Amino acid sequence: MLLTAVLTAAEEGGFIALNPETGTTTQGETVAETVQNLKEATSLYLEEFPMNIHAHPLVTTFEVAHA
């Protein structure tokens, strides 16, 4: 099953990851560790809450004014 991983840099160092299809989140010190942690968290989630995921989210960027 191919899923989406969205990673952002954490203020305190490392990375935070989100899988938008399931809503699972995790963190790690490196990109590789963070993705591995997200795989594990998402697998555990899907064991408890099986779902058929066929559509992937549309990921885009947008700009907002910041005061």
Language-model region placement:
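Short, charged, surface-exposed hinge/linker loops at domain edges
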Residues: M1-T4, A32, Q36-A67
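Short aromatic-glycine-(Arg/Gly/Cys) micro-motifs in beta-strand/loop hairpins
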Residues: V6-E21
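Generic alpha-helical hydrophobic packing signal
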Residues: A17, T25, E63-H66
